[in-house]
Curated annotation (Swiss-Prot):
Protein name: tRNA-specific 2-thiouridylase MnmA
Alphabetical keyword list: ATP-binding, Cytoplasm, Disulfide bond, Nucleotide-binding, RNA-binding, Transferase, tRNA processing, tRNA-binding
Active site: 109, 208
Statement: the UniProt record of this protein carries the keyword Cytoplasm: yes
Sites annotated Interaction with tRNA: 135, 354
C-alpha cells in the first residue's frame, strides 16, 4: 500500500517540484495550501504596496497552487491558520521588536505552524503518513544512533536548515524534504519540463507568509513611533534623529538618514528606554564585534549525547544569521538549553533576538535565541 504524503503547496516553484518528485517516487500525494495572513483583518495597511491589488497575493498563490495540483492530477486541500499565526508567531514578533530585539518569524512559523499545526492536521485529519515541504534541507535516519538527522542541502546558497533548527525528532520522523539533492536551476528546469505554471515564478521574500513590505512602515501598523537621538557611540555627539529605536537592527546601515557624513555609519547599540540609537563609523567597526554570546531556549533536534562526548563543553560550528559562513564555536553549558557560545573569529553584528544555529559537519544540531552579546 502506498504511503500518503501531504505536501505544503504554497504556489511557488519549490513546493510544486517537491510534489512532482514524490509522485515519481511512488507516494500517494495530496496538496495542502495554508492561508496564514489576512491583510484586512490584521490591519496590514502602511507599507503594503499590494493592498489595492484586485487579487491579493495570498489568493493568487492559492490559484497557482490549484493549477499545479490540477496539472499533477492531485487533490488540493485548503486550511486557514490566520488566528494561529497571529497568536504563535506575530504577537511574539511584535513583542520582541518593542523590546528592541530582532526576532526571526520564519523560524517561529516553521516551529508553530508548518511543522505543528499543519503537520497535525495532515496526520490526524487527512490521514497522511508524512508531510513534505519545498525546503532546501534533508532528513536521514542514522541506524547507529537511531536518530533522525536534519542535513544541509546540496545547494549551499539556498540551504534552509537555519530556519528549521527548532524541529524535533518527532517532527523530523514525519517529514520528507525531496529537494535536498537539487540546486535551484535544476528545480526550475524540472518545473518547466513538466509544464508547471510556477516554473518562472519569482521566489517569495520578506516576512514568512506576509511577503514584501516597506518594513518600518509595516511595523508602524503595530508599534507607535518613539522618536529620539542618533548618537556617535565613540564621541557621544548627537548626529541626527530617528522615529523609533525598535525599527533598527544591529549592523544596519541604510535608513539612518545621516546626510553630509564623510563615511557610512552602522547601528552599534540601542537603548530603548532612553530612545537612543548608538552608531559607529565604517572606519571603526570594533563596536560591532563580539567574542561571546549567551544563547537561550536551545532546541536540540536530536539526542546530543549520541554525537558529542561531553555535552557540558564542546566545539562545533554555528551560524548567527542566515547565509553567514559557519563560524567555529565553543559551547559551555550554563543550564538546560542555555549555553555560553564563544568564538575566536571576527564576527560582526551578532544580534539579540536572532537565532544561533549549530552544526556538526552537515548535520544541523539545533538552535536557540541569542540573548546577550559580549
Amino acid at each position: 500500500m502506498k504511503k500518503k504524503v501531504i505536501v505544503g503547496l504554497s504556489g511557488g516553484v519549490d513546493s510544486s517540484v517537491a510534489a512532482y518528485l514524490l509522485i515519481q517516487q511512488g507516494y500517494e500525494v495530496e496538496g495542502l495550501f495554508m492561508r496564514n495572513w489576512d491583510s484586512s483583518a490584521n490591519n496590514d495597511i502602511l507599507g503594503n504596496q499590494e493592498i489595492d491589488n484586485d487579487v491579493c497575493p495570498q489568493e493568487q498563490d492559492y490559484l497557482d497552487a490549484l493549477e499545479v495540483a490540477n496539472k499533477l492530477g492531485i487533490k488540493l486541500h485548503r486550511i486557514d491558520f490566520v488566528q494561529e499565526y497571529w497568536e504563535y508567531v506575530f504577537e511574539y514578533f511584535i513583542k520582541e521588536y518593542k523590546k528592541g530585539r530582532t526576532p526571526n518569524p520564519d523560524i517561529l512559523c516553521n516551529k508553530y505552524i508548518k511543522f505543528d499545526k499543519f503537520l497535525n492536521h495532515a496526520i490526524n485529519e487527512l490521514k497522511a503518513d508524512y508531510i513534505a515541504m519545498g525546503h532546501y534541507a534533508g532528513v536521514r535516519f542514522n541506524e547507529k544512533t537511531k536518530q533522525y538527522e536534519m542535513i544541509r542541502a546540496v545547494d549551499t546558497n539556498k540551504d534552509q536548515t537555519y530556519f528549521l533548527c527548532q524541529l524535533t525528532q518527532n517532527q523530523l520522523s514525519k517529514t520528507l524534504f525531496p529537494l535536498q539533492s537539487l540546486e535551484k536551476p535544476e528545480i526550475r528546469k524540472i518545473a518547466a519540463e513538466q509544464g508547471l505554471i510556477t516554473a518562472d515564478k519569482k521566489d517569495s521574500t520578506g516576512i514568512c507568509f506576509i511577503g514584501e513590505r516597506e518594513f518600518t512602515k509595516f511595523l508602524q501598523n503595530y508599534i507607535s513611533n518613539q522618536p529620539g537621538d542618533i548618537v556617535d557611540i565613540k564621541t557621544n555627539e548627537v548626529l541626527g534623529k530617528h522615529i523609533g529605536a525598535m525599527y533598527y537592527t544591529i549592523g544596519q546601515r541604510k535608513g539612518l538618514n545621516l546626510g553630509g557624513m564623510k563615511e557610512p555609519y552602522y547601528v552599534a547599540a540601542k537603548d530603548i528606554d532612553k530612545k537612543i540609537i548608538y552608531v559607529c563609523p565604517a572606519s571603526d567597526e570594533s563596536y560591532l564585534l563580539s567574542n561571546n554570546a549567551i544563547v537561550t531556549e536551545i532546541n536540540w533536534s536530536l539526542d546530543l549525547k549520541q554525537y558529542i562526548d561531553n555535552v557540558e563543553e564542546f566545539e562545533c560550528t554555528a551560524k548567527f544569521r542566515y547565509r553567514q559562513p559557519d563560524v567555529k564555536v565553543r559551547l559551555n553549558k550554563i543550564k538546560d538549553n542555555e549555553y555560553k557560545v564563544s568564538y575566536d573569529a571576527i564576527v560582526k553584528a551578532v544580534t539579540p533576538g536572532q537565532e544561533a544555529v549549530f552544526y556538526l559537519n552537515d548535520i544541523c544540531l539545533g538552535g536557540g535565541i541569542i540573548d546577550i552579546v559580549e
